[in-house]
Structure formats: structure tokens, C-alpha cells
């Protein structure tokens, strides 16, 4: 008698396996959402932090913008060491370096064959040096990427403003792109046109920065010669990156990596991006570790504190932007020891804060998982990979990730990253922590009223007072399409002391300060009445901090003992003051005066000068 096997359970199991396999095959990957980054943009955004190095004749003339007639003989550093620059930048957490190969004065840090206004006519190395080449080699040696800043504006060149200068400009750009290896970024400054030396004419030349340089042709040359480079351009044709509208070191708490391909870009779009833009143009936050971009000994006591640098990090990298942090080269040809120590301390603090992700020892679940597939499970957000992500089903634009700690846990930082290879999606989210038996809403303490839990992008970091909780809910309240979250992090950052203002400064609150003018030009001057005559030798002007209106860009300074008879002390330009509204310092031979008047010969916008503070240096 034959034994008849019961195959029903086996067949059921095989059918179940086949069904699961079929379901797995039917779960498609999410479609892209709007514009997405190209390979170069993605690589740049993944760098997060890289250094700016400002170095030129300005270093030795104590200026921010050279006029173009400065003597190359002043350029003779005694301790110049590009390897020290690179070691410092690497220790400060920077992944690359951008050098000001030529600033507005026109002086070149490489021996360009197209001009005599370069280091080949300086005493340094008897004119045989090449700082661009030396730095490119040092970056390669230490594993950092290298890039160049080339100012389109050249206040030295006789042909600036004429068609022949564009050829000169491209010839110099070609030298930089073909002689120094791979370039990760080409940086074109937005300052274009104005007064200058211009071969000895000493005149003002204005250009249309959108058309004069013929940017499309220049871009084609860059793409051909350096196909891995991104282009930063605040002066014309849309580049691969955008300026964020300020040099103070912050971008908007809402920050879309999108703009339109063409058209004007108002300040709001620079700072916040454009939610429905048709081009991927991420923000790059550029700021200096000192008030100015070039080295000034007077700023040795004004290097950004550790707490200020961390604030800058949270408001740039932590808001879906890269951070381009400037280290000015000092007169010895080195990154100053003060700047170096502060930059390295900054890197160590970032490492300390983000080295221990508390979420990786917790359990994470999601309210929705795409197709219930392990490929898109919530566990992906704590696997330390940028190539995996949690995804929700199509049509789901609200979802929650819940982090359950194995014991009450103290934390004060939350980090999230979208899988931006498929676009930027999330437009609003919230955080709630289970403290005891109560759910508590967490607010961003770096934003007024805690608002601003909106966009995420490449990385978003939220700071809040330390709490002790057993669960944390990351609630996505709105998303353009199904949300894709690559990583989340929960951290406990140490407390940092707040900045303490410098002591001993004599501020304008001690004086009578009024805005005055004439019948023809009302409100053009700032008048300081010290109530009695004093010996003065300096004047400081702090522009308005929350508006671009009323900023004095060109000035004259006058003194008087009686308020009727005035003597001009000095006049000139406050370079780059609109973009970087820091203290503007004027020093002069000690003179006796009761009244000081700062005239706004030109102001940025509006018809009335404005100020945040005034300081007078009174001789004792």
C-alpha cells in the first residue's frame, strides 16, 4: 500500500513565498520630486564645510578692497607656509580650500603671463613664486580639495569695462583651470564695477554684470576644462550654487535648494530659496572667522568665539547649506595662531556634539512604510548610510517616525536628512518628546518663537533646551510628495558660554547723536555732539543690521569745535559694507573737536542714512 503525502502545507508555504516575492517586485522606488542635484552639486553638498583663504596686497595695506594701484613691492611675507594653511584647515574640519587667486585690486597670486601685476614682480622669492601652484600641491598632499576665486572686477587693468578685458579675464581663468589639477569650485564675486586705478585713469567704470562678461561662453569653458567643478556666481548667469544674501554666517530657517533657471533673484529667494523653483541651486553660506575678509591686526581681539562658530554651523550646515569659512592669511604668510586655535576648537566641538547618536541605541518605527518593504523600513534612518532611506507610500504626505529609547535619555539636538538625490520634499515638521507621561513640543531655540520647523534638505539641525525623555516623535506634517528620510540623529551637546562684549568701548549712547541734513539732502549725515571739546583720533560706524537701507557706502568725516566751522578729516569708501555690515573703523591724526559729522556721500538704498551704533576714540 502506497503512502500518500499531504502536500497542502508545503504548497501553501511555496505560494506564500511566491506572493511575497511578487509583492517585493511590485514595490517601485519613489519618483523624483522636482529638480534634483547633479553629481557635482551632490559632492559639494556632502563636503559640508570648506575654507576660504583671503590673501593679497590688501593684507599689507590694511584694506578690504584694493584700489588697483598698490605697489607689488609690499608683498614680501617672511614665513609663508602653504602647508601650514592646509594643516590648519584640515584640523578645523574643512574638506577643501578656495583661494583668492585674484581679488578686486587685480594682483595675481600666480605668475600670470597676461599681466605684470602679479607676484612675479614682488620681492617674494625674487619673483619666482607661485602661491596657487604651491597650495594646490599642498591640498593634494593632505587630501583636501582645491578651488579658486577669481574676481571678475579688476581695478588695475586698463581695459576693464571694454570688450578686450573679457578676453583677458578668460585667459587668466584658463590658466587657473589648466595648470593646477582638479578644481572643485570656481568662485566669481558679485562686486563688479566702480572707481579704480584702471591703468592710471583713476576713474569710475560701470558695467552690466549680467551681460558684460558673456557668462554662457565662460561657463562652457569651465565645463570643458573642469567638468567636476561647480560654479558660484552672484553677478550674472545662474550658477550651480547661490549666495544666501548675507555674509553674517546664516541662511533662512526655511531653505529650499531651488531657484528658477532664469530671472531676477530677490533677497528673499537668496536667503530662503524658492519652494517651486525649476532648478537645483543650493545655498552656500560664506562668512569670515574675523569681522573682515582680509587680515587686520586690529581684529586680533575680534575673532569669532567658539559659541559664535557653533551658532554659525547650526545656521548654515544645520539649515541645508554648506559653510564656506574664511581664514585670512596674516602678514607673515600664515593663518594667524588665534584663528588657527579657534578653528581647531570649533572642529573638535562639532565632533564632540555629533559623535554619539543616541538614536542608534533606540528602536525606530514609522506610521507608514512604502509597501511594507524592508527596503524602505524605518531602520534605515539609523544605519549610518547616505544611500538608504525610509520612504512612505505614494500619496502619503504626513507621517511619523517614533524613536523609543531603552531608558529615560537626556538630549538637546535633533538632526534629520532627506534623500536629496530624489529631490527636496518636506515643507513642515514638528518634534514631540515623551517626558514622564506628558508629550512636550520641542521648538528651535535659534528661531524667534521657535517657529521655522519647515524644510530639511541635505541636513537640518534643531536646537532646544536639554530634556529627559523616553520617546521622541518626528512628525512630518507636510511634504510635496511621499517623504524620504535618509538619517536622523539625537544628541546631547555641552553647554557653551555666551559671548561677552569687549570692555572699554565708548559707545554713542554717551553722546548726543542725531541724523541731520540740508534742505536739498535731508538725513544725509550723522552728527555727534560730545558736549565739550576733546582730543579725538578715531571714529567707528556700525551700519544698520536688519535692513539694507540707509547704509553709508561712501563717506566724508568732518570735525568742528563750534558746530559752524568744519574741517574735513578723511573721505573714502566702506568696501563691501552692504553685504558685510560690520564696524567700519576710521583713524586719523589726533584733533580737538566737540562735534563730529559723518556724511553719507553715497548710501545703499533709500534717502536717509541709518546706523546701529557709533563709537569715538577719545584720547586720554
Enumerate the language-model features and the residues they cover.
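Bacterial N-terminal signal peptides
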Residues: 11-19
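Mature catalytic domains of secreted/periplasmic carbohydrate-active enzymes
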Residues: 25-397, 402-403, 408-410, 415-417, ...
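Compositionally biased low-complexity segments at domain edges in trafficked proteins
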Residues: 507-511
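Bacterial N-terminal signal peptides that target proteins for export
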Residues: 1-10
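Aromatic, loop-rich ligand-recognition surfaces of beta-strand-rich domains
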Residues: 338, 345, 350-353, 383-443, ...
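Sec/Tat signal peptide C-region and signal peptidase I cleavage site
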Residues: 20-24
Amino acid at each position: 500500500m502506497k503512502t500518500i503525502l499531504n502536500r497542502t502545507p508545503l504548497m501553501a508555504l511555496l505560494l506564500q513565498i511566491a506572493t511575497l516575492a511578487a509583492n517585493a517586485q511590485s514595490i517601485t522606488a519613489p519618483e523624483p520630486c522636482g529638480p534634483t542635484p547633479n553629481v557635482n552639486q551632490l559632492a559639494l553638498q556632502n563636503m559640508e564645510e570648506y575654507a576660504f583663504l583671503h590673501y593679497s596686497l590688501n593684507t599689507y595695506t590694511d584694506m578690504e578692497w584694493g584700489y588697483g594701484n598698490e605697489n607689488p613691492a609690499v608683498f614680501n611675507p617672511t614665513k609663508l607656509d602653504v602647508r601650514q594653511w592646509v594643516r590648519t584647515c584640515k584640523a578645523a574640519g574643512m574638506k577643501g580650500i578656495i583661494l583668492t587667486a585674484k581679488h578686486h585690486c587685480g594682483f595675481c597670486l600666480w605668475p600670470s603671463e597676461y599681466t605684470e601685476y602679479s607676484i612675479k614682480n614682488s620681492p617674494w622669492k625674487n619673483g619666482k613664486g607661485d602661491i596657487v601652484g604651491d597650495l594646490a600641491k599642498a591640498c593634494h598632499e593632505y587630501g583636501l580639495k582645491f578651488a579658486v576665486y577669481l574676481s571678475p572686477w579688476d581695478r588695475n587693468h586698463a581695459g576693464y569695462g571694454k570688450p578686450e578685458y573679457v578676453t583677458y579675464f578668460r585667459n587668466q581663468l584658463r590658466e587657473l583651470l589648466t595648470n593646477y589639477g582638479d578644481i572643485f569650485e570656481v568662485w566669481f564675486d558679485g562686486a563688479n564695477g566702480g572707481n579704480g586705478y584702471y591703468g592710471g585713469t583713476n576713474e569710475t567704470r560701470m558695467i552690466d554684470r549680467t551681460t558684460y562678461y558673456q557668462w554662457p561662453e565662460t561657463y562652457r569653458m569651465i565645463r570643458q576644462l573642469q567638468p567636476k567643478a561647480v560654479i558660484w556666481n552672484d553677478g550674472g548667469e545662474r550658477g550651480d550654487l547661490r549666495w544666501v544674501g548675507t555674509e553674517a554666517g546664516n541662511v533662512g530657517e526655511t531653505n529650499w535648494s531651488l531657484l528658477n533657471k532664469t530671472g531676477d533673484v530677490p533677497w528673499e529667494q537668496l536667503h530662503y530659496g524658492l519652494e517651486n523653483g525649476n532648478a537645483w541651486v543650493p545655498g552656500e553660506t560664506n562668512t569670515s572667522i574675523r569681522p573682515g575678509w582680509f587680515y587686520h591686526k586690529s581684529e586680533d581681539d575680534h575673532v569669532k568665539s567658539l559659541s559664535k562658530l557653533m551658532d554659525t554651523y547650526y545656521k548654515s550646515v544645520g539649515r541645508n547649506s554648506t559653510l564656506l569659512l574664511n581664514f585670512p592669511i596674516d602678514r607673515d604668510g600664515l593663518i594667524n595662531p588665534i584663528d588657527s586655535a579657534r578653528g581647531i576648537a570649533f572642529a573638535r566641538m562639532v565632533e564632540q556634539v555629533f559623535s554619539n547618536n543616541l538614536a542608534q541605541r533606540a528602536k525606530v518605527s514609522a506610521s507608514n512604510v512604502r509597501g511594507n518593504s524592508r527596503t524602505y523600513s524605518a531602520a534605515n534612518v539609523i544605519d549610518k548610510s547616505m544611500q538608504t532611506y525610509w520612504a512612505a507610500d505614494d500619496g502619503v504626505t504626513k507621517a511619523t517616525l517614533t524613536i523609543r529609547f531603552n531608558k529615560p535619555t537626556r538630549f538637546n539636538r535633533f538632526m534629520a536628512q532627506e534623500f536629496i538625490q530624489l529631490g527636496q520634499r518636506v515643507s513642515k515638521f514638528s518634534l514631540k518628546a515623551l517626558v514622564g507621561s506628558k508629550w512636550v513640543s520641542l521648538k528651535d531655540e535659534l528661531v524667534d518663537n521657535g517657529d521655522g520647523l519647515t524644510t530639511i534638505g541635505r541636513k537640518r539641525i534643531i536646537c532646544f533646551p536639554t530634556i529627559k525623555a523616553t520617546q521622541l516623535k518626528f512628525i512630518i506634517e507636510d511634504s510635496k510628495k511621499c517623504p524620504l528620510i535618509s538619517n536622523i540623529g539625537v544628541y546631547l551637546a555641552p553647554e557653551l558660554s555666551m559671548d561677552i562684549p569687549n570692555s572699554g568701548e565708548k559707545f554713542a549712547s554717551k553722546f548726543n547723536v542725531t541724523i541731520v541734513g540740508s534742505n536739498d539732502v535731508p538725513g544725509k549725515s550723522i552728527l555727534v555732539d560730545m558736549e565739550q571739546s576733546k582730543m579725538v583720533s578715531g571714529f567707528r560706524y556700525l551700519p544698520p543690521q536688519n535692513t539694507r537701507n540707509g547704509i553709508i557706502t561712501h563717506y566724508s568725516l568732518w570735525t568742528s569745535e563750534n558746530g559752524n566751522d568744519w574741517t574735513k578729516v578723511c573721505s573714502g569708501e566702506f568696501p563691501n559694507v552692504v553685504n558685510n555690515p560690520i564696524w567700519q573703523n576710521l583713524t586719523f591724526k589726533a584733533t580737538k573737536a566737540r562735534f563730529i559729522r559723518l556724511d553719507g556721500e553715497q548710501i545703499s538704498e533709500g534717502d536717509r542714512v541709518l546706523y546701529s551704533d557709533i563709537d569715538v576714540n577719545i584720547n586720554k
